From Swiss-Prot:
Keyword set, alphabetical order: Cytoplasm, Lipid biosynthesis, Lipid metabolism, Metal-binding, NAD, NADP, Oxidoreductase, Phospholipid biosynthesis, Phospholipid metabolism, Zinc
Stated name of the protein: Glycerol-1-phosphate dehydrogenase [NAD(P)+]
An MF annotation (GO) of this entry: glycerol-1-phosphate dehydrogenase (NAD+) activity
Binding site for NAD(+): G103, R104, S105, I106, D107, T125, A126, A127, S128, S134
Organism: Methanosarcina mazei (strain ATCC BAA-159 / DSM 3647 / Goe1 / Go1 / JCM 11833 / OCM 88)
Binding positions (substrate): D130, D177, H261
Reaction it catalyzes: sn-glycerol 1-phosphate + NAD(+) = dihydroxyacetone phosphate + NADH + H(+); sn-glycerol 1-phosphate + NADP(+) = dihydroxyacetone phosphate + NADPH + H(+)
Length: 356
C-alpha cells in the first residue's frame, strides 16, 4: 500500500531532549550540558530567593564543568525584562540560558532564548505550573498578561529534594493547573465539533492522563513528600509535551485559564495561577455538565483552594471574571461561547459553592 503524505498536515513538535526528575539531580547540570554539547558562557536567570535555593549552586556546578557563568536577578515577568535579558546575553556572549526558579525566571529565559535563537535549560525550584516544560511563556506585555509561543527547553532538571522543600502551596497550585486539563480538553473537543478546529487525539489523551493521575492520587499528595513532588513534576512535564505535540496550549488551557487570566486583570490581589485555574475548572466542569464535584473533592484532598474565600478574592471579582473570561482570547472557542449572562455567572458560582 502506498503511503500518501499530506504536507499541509505536518506539525513541528519541539520537545525537551533530556528530562531529569529525582533527588539530587541538580548536581547533574554539568553532565547535562556536556551531553547536550552546551559550551561557553551560560547566563543564569533567577530571582533573589531562588538564587539562594539553587541559582548559586547551578553557577558553581557549571563553572566546575568548565563553563563561565553570569547571573541576572529578575523581579517581574515583563517584555521589558525580556529585552534586558537579551541585551545582557549579547553583552556577555552567552551561548545558552538557564531559567532557575518557580515560573517567572523560566518564562523569561524561555522567551529571551527563543528570540536570541540559543538553547535554554529549565531548572524549576517549585512545581506550581506547567510552564516548566512547555513551549509557551507567560509575560506581561503592554500591561496585559500574554501567553506567547516560544521554544521548549532543551532540558528540564527537576530536583525533587528542592521542589518538595518549597512552600506546599506551590505544589498544590501545580495540581490545580494539571487538573484543569479536563475542561481544557472538553473545550477543545467542543471547538472541534462546532468550529471544525483541529483536535489532536494523542495530545488530548496525554493531557487527560496527567489530570487523571493527579486526581487518583489526590489522597497521597502531601507536604514535604518527594514522592508527591515527583508525581506532580512528571504530570507537569506531560502537560508541556502535550502542548508541544498539539502545537498550541489547547490540551492544557481552556475556559478555566481564561477565567484565571480575567481574575489577574481585575482582582486587586490575584492568587497563584494554578489555584485560580483549579477553581475555574470546578465551574467550567459544571457548565460542561460533567462531574464538577470530583474536581472539587480532589482539590480539597490536595489542599488547594476550591472557593473565593480560600483564594482570598472577593465574590464580586469571581462574577466579573466569569463575565469577562470569554473575551480574554476571542479566537479560542470554549464552553463560554459569546459570554455568560450575569444570572448565569451567579448561578454557576453559587451552585458549585465557589461563592456563598
Amino acid at each position: 500500500m502506498k503511503l500518501t503524505i499530506n504536507k499541509n498536515s505536518a506539525k513541528w513538535m519541539q520537545l525537551p531532549r533530556d528530562v531529569l526528575v529525582g533527588h539530587g539531580v541538580l548536581e547533574e547540570v554539568g553532565d547535562v550540558c556536556r551531553d547536550l554539547k552546551l559550551k561557553g558562557n551560560a547566563l543564569i536567570v533567577t530571582g533573589s530567593t531562588t538564587q539562594d535555593v539553587a541559582g548559586k549552586r547551578v553557577s558553581r556546578l557549571l563553572e566546575d564543568a568548565g563553563n563561565s557563568t553570569e547571573t541576572v536577578l529578575t523581579c517581574r515577568a515583563t517584555m521589558e525584562e525580556v529585552d534586558k535579558l537579551m541585551e545582557k546575553a549579547l553583552n556577555t556572549e552567552a551561548t545558552f540560558l538557564l531559567g532557575v526558579g518557580s515560573g517567572r525566571s523560566i518564562d523569561l529565559a524561555k522567551l529571551a532564548s527563543t528570540r536570541l535563537e540559543i538553547p535554554f535549560i529549565s531548572v524549576p525550584t517549585a512545581a506550581s505550573h506547567d510552564g516548566i516544560a512547555s513551549s509557551r511563556a507567560s509575560v506581561i506585555d503592554n500591561g496585559k498578561n500574554a501567553s506567547i509561543q516560544a521554544q521548549a527547553p532543551l532540558a528540564v532538571i527537576a530536583d525533587t529534594e528542592i521542589i518538595s522543600a518549597a512552600p506546599y502551596r506551590f505544589l498544590a497550585a501545580g495540581c490545580g493547573d494539571i487538573i484543569s486539563n479536563y475542561t481544557a480538553v472538553l473545550d477543545w473537543e467542543l471547538a472541534s465539533r462546532l468550529r471544525n478546529e483541529y483536535f489532536g487525539e494523542y495530545a488530548a489523551a496525554l493531557s487527560r492522563m496527567a489530570a487523571r493521575v493527579v486526581i487518583e492520587n489526590a489522597d497521597s499528595i502531601k507536604p514535604d513528600h518527594e514522592t508527591s513532588a515527583r508525581l506532580v513534576v512528571k504530570a507537569l512535564v506531560s502537560n508541556g509535551v502535550a502542548m508541544s505535540i498539539a502545537g498550541s496550549s489547547r490540551p492544557a488551557s481552556g475556559s478555566e485559564h481564561m477565567f484565571s487570566h480575567a481574575l489577574d486583570r481585575i482582582a486587586p490581589k490575584a492568587a497563584l495561577h494554578g489555584e485560580q485555574c483549579g477553581v475555574g475548572t470546578i465551574m467550567m466542569m459544571y457548565l460542561h455538565g460533567g462531574n464538577w464535584q470530583e474536581i472539587r473533592d480532589a482539590l480539597k484532598k490536595i489542599g488547594a483552594p476550591t472557593n473565593a474565600e480560600e483564594l482570598g478574592i472577593e465574590d464580586k471579582y469571581i462574577i466579573e471574571a466569569l463575565l469577562q473570561a470569554h473575551s480574554i482570547r476571542p479566537d479560542r472557542y470554549t464552553i463560554l461561547g459569546n459570554g455568560l449572562t450575569l444570572s448565569a455567572a451567579e448561578k454557576v458560582a453559587r451552585i458549585t459553592k465557589v461563592i456563598n
